[in-house]
Swiss-Prot record:
Gene responsible for this protein: N
Family: Belongs to the arenaviridae nucleocapsid protein family.
Keywords of the record: Capsid protein, Helical capsid protein, Host cytoplasm, Host-virus interaction, Inhibition of host IKBKE by virus, Inhibition of host innate immune response by virus, Inhibition of host RLR pathway by virus, Interferon antiviral system evasion, Metal-binding, Ribonucleoprotein, RNA-binding, Viral immunoevasion, Viral nucleoprotein, Virion, Zinc, Zinc-finger
GO cellular component: helical viral capsid; host cell cytoplasm; ribonucleoprotein complex; viral nucleocapsid
Organism: Alethinophid 1 reptarenavirus (isolate AlRrV1/Boa/USA/BC/2009) (Golden Gate virus)
Zinc finger map (CHCC-type, atypical): 545-570
Gene3D superfamilies: Arenaviral nucleoprotein, C-terminal domain, Arenavirus nucleocapsid protein, head domain
InterPro entries in alphabetical order: Nucleocapsid_C_arenaviridae, Nucleocapsid_C_sf, Nucleocapsid_N_arenaviridae
Protein name: Nucleoprotein
Amino acid sequence: MAAFQKAAVNQLALKKKLNKMLAPYQRELNNQIFKDVKALRVGLDINKVNDTLRRLRKETKGPNDLKNLRDLNETAAGLSGMVATQRTVEIDSSLMSDEELIQCIENIDVIKKKAEYKGGSRPRISEFESETGMSKSDHEMFNKLFNRFAPKKDPGPAAFSTPKSWVGISPADLANQFGTSPAITICLIMMRTNSPFKQILDALHDISLLDQGMFVNASVVKAMTSQHPCLDCVEYTVPKNSSGYNITVKAVVKAANVLSKLPKVEKLVIDDDNRVEIIRTLLTIQRELNIKIQVNEERGLFEDIFYKICVSPNGPCVVSIRSELTGRGWENTIFRLRRPPPYAPRLYPDLMDLDLDALPPVKGDKKTEEESKIYIFKPAADEIDEYIRSPESASSDSEIPDPRVLYMANACEDLFKGGDSVFMDIEGTAQDPVEIALFNPDTGKFVHIFRMPKDKDGFKKASKHAHGLLLDDISDHPDLQTDKNIEAFFSKVPLSARIFCQGSDIEECLKFFGRKDLKPTDCKWKREEFMKYHENILDELSEVFPCKHSGTVKDKKGALTAPHCALLDCLMFSRTASGGKKTKDPTPATI
């Protein structure tokens, strides 16, 4: 326990020293962050974000899942101003002493080996090889001799093998695709909580203050949630491949620090003039604190900053989006050592080639300048429902007919053309549903209805633990309907209709909308019976799925989970009833 406390104190002392000594190279990035938030808020599709997160939660992922992530990263990079672009990085060795240059190269070499072992492109040296000093060929010969002459023991039970997370994917294609961006993090907090921008800034300000003197962890953020409700969307349990679209504690702290007025390493901005000075400062800190980078240890704060300074293109090296870069940092970077250190050709011949061609630029910056100020506007809610139901309109001489009443009645008739069997599901309570879906498996036609909740507190609670809907998701949805419109729809359901569902709440919902005569059939499936089709259906239909659930849904452990969706549930019920057979692709029922 004492050793753990000592290590934690050393890391905290290191963080304070890095923040302080690197302060001359830090810049205010707030204006650019705010511009990026504004652009992302408008251009980022929350449905694609949710689909990407769902794919990354899979135990086994393939090429289609990676393509989905890379496409989303490309969209985010196109909307952002702080994007790292591929270029040649030169380190002027004439400004460094021999000791500094040798230490710099050794650090990069160890970081490179560590990344290769972790990425699987190079096998990790076993503890046995390390202790005996054997080469790989010696170790193989030892194993042959040992198996031939040494007495054999009972192997015991077979060890549990963990399946590969990515199948059919080169580790090089995964590089630079999982970093976080403060602008994306802030944008997603706004989308998932519908919190005012000022409230989010207040929460991030408090986090940055705390992080100046301690390490802000999950327990700290949880404690702050009561004062800052916008932090309720933070994920405390994340999958192995968490991405820049997971609102993790680390991502929130990073966003808080880059907006802080205090000295923070997140605000580092490098260029050709200060890169070597920053490296020399880091090497001074390394000597003073006796820091040694180890291959068999997790990447620490020092080596993370050191690596980014040495191999990153000019600009904000800690918070820039790096998904536009290909390969590892040392592949994107060419070190032109203009004055080789002593014995460098013998120790590091791979770094001494001074005739390497520079990498061509991948993508130019085509973004136009925007206003320096940020204005985030919340769309005004459609007030037609309130106008139609207002006392003034009821007492007026001429009643304004709602065209959606006729539309919904015709949609119901279209739904039951070609078959009387439908699956039905709702989100919310039977007397206060916020989402209603019906799906006809014979024709593939569906009706998808949204409704504003009466019980706002109950809605917010269900949003966090079930459907993930926000009020904006409903109020801005083209399928938003009033009770009168929904009653018009159900009034056209034929008596011959066979409605299949899961749970007794569907019958109560039908009664609420005036159809006491309809008796739905409760299938009473176990959850695992229909949930096994969840991923396959979304993989097939994610591009055309009309549902939008922007909120954060977390399980009991605080891990992000898929939101419940009434239409998706209907499709799963249909797939279950057919024994797993694929039904017709869903299309909306229209006039």
